Amino acid sequence: MRFVIVTGMSGAGKSSVLKMLEDSSYFCVDNLPIPFIMKFARLAVKESANITKVALGIDIRSGQALEELGKVLEDVKSAGYQYEILFLEASTEILVKRYKETRRMHPLSGTGRVDKGIELERRKLRFLKERADYIIDTSRLLVRELKTEIDNIFVQDGTYRNFFITVLSFGFKYGLPNDADLVFDVRFLQNPYYVPKLKSKTGNEPEVRDFVLSLEQAEEFLTKLMDMLLFLIPNYIAEGKNQLVIGIGCTGGRHRSVTLANEITKRLSATEYGVKAEHRDVEKG
């Protein structure tokens, strides 16, 4: 029997993940009182002929009982029941935005600020995150991308490295991306904006792509950058990092940075790491 505990930050997607698992024939229970977990594990094993996949949702709503969870999980493991913990994470900025969009109160914020409740929850759940077998940061994931990750881990039994890369193109004229871990300035390349037939196009279109990638400096930059990234990424993983945002900036964020972000994403896709491209400013004038 596969026994998965789904937990993490409120607003990070736990309910969505439980629904995805339920759609994949998991027997799902959300917010089961912590003292009942051992009984639940025993019952699930007893019914394993009929129930082969189980998912249990646990979150901050467990209140004071959450402090007992560590001991309960140790007891479950000591009794011979194997489980996996999936921890769903997201940045404070994204969680605040999600709460504002849904007009819901954070369970720990009371009548105060949402961000204060989020930081308190983050501290209370730190011990669970440290125990997690899988950590997924949903800050930049679309629902379908999250489903792909869940299917890979819990449905198709694929491998998962707890690490996801976003290659983000942007325009310096609109400011630096707040969440970028690494930023590279590609304004040293010839600008397609000043080529009349390319001015109105973007780096997503083949004419601009061909122009940028035909530049000798572009290929040299890509080669050196890939060498550096393939050195850095395993070391980031070794230090416990689970996501990397690589900012690629040009003047307006429409031509050079878009092409190079797409090309870097393509080259990283040939490795074992999960990666996607985002273009922050491509639609801006």
From Swiss-Prot:
PANTHER family per UniProt: RNASE ADAPTER PROTEIN RAPZ
Keyword tags: ATP-binding, GTP-binding, Nucleotide-binding
Function comment: Displays ATPase and GTPase activities.
Protein's UniProt keywords contain RNA-binding: no
Organism superkingdom: Bacteria
Cleaved signal peptide residues: none
A GO molecular function held by the record: GTP binding
Binding site for GTP: D59, I60, R61, S62
Disulfide partners: none
Protein name: Nucleotide-binding protein Cphy_0331
Binding-site residues, ATP: G8, M9, S10, G11, A12, G13, K14, S15
Keyword ATP-binding carried by entry: yes
UniProt record similarity statement: Belongs to the RapZ-like family.
Source organism: Lachnoclostridium phytofermentans (strain ATCC 700394 / DSM 18823 / ISDg) (Clostridium phytofermentans)
A matching Pfam family: RapZ-like_N
